[in-house]
Amino acid sequence: MSNLVSILGAGESGVGSAILAQKEGFDVWVSDSGQIKPQYKAELEKYGIAYEEGGHDVEKILSSVKIVKSPGIADTVPILKQAADQNIQIEGEIEFAAAYTNAVLIGITGTNGKTTTTLLTHHLLQKAGLKVGLAGNVGYSFAKQVAEENHEYYVLELSSFQLDGMHTVRLDYAVLLNITPDHLDRYDSFQGYIESKFRINNHQTSAQRFIYCADDEVIKNQLKNHNN
């Protein structure tokens, strides 16, 4: 049976995912359709992780038990559609890494203000003496920190693209700041973007917390029909 995890995209999240996958005992293959930046190539070589650039070895990737994709890669690209047709598990870095940590996870999203809010939250927790990591759409790779650090908390800035790659993650604290039209080149409609943002509290239990802006009209309207 295959033990191969293929990583699509060799940027910060992809290389971090590769390092974690290797640590967890998987065979790892990193594939990037473009050119890999020198610092990421050097990191892959440091860990002895196999990679390719300038294209995809489709046959090899489709032999994977799992594909971890970078957030900028849409689910509609041909290789991912082929993988989905073959029932290969496809997920993002956050989903992949969350399975290997017991830390408290704080996720923050919103069309505007999420970076500032994430940085401030991380700063406050750090000043309180907590062992906290900063990751997601800001800071260093979440997966690499899970592989090499031992943080008790993670503050994650989550874009809609990252949320789309999360299927089972239960955030201990999910924060939704606001929603205004954005990334409509990626989504079929504004409603699709709204639903992507609301993925932040999918799968939360009654012991976990969903914090949102009650003054945001889009959020208020979506809450009427939203089921956790």
PLM regions with names:
Residues 1-92, 96, 217:
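N-terminal leader/targeting and accessory segments in enzymes
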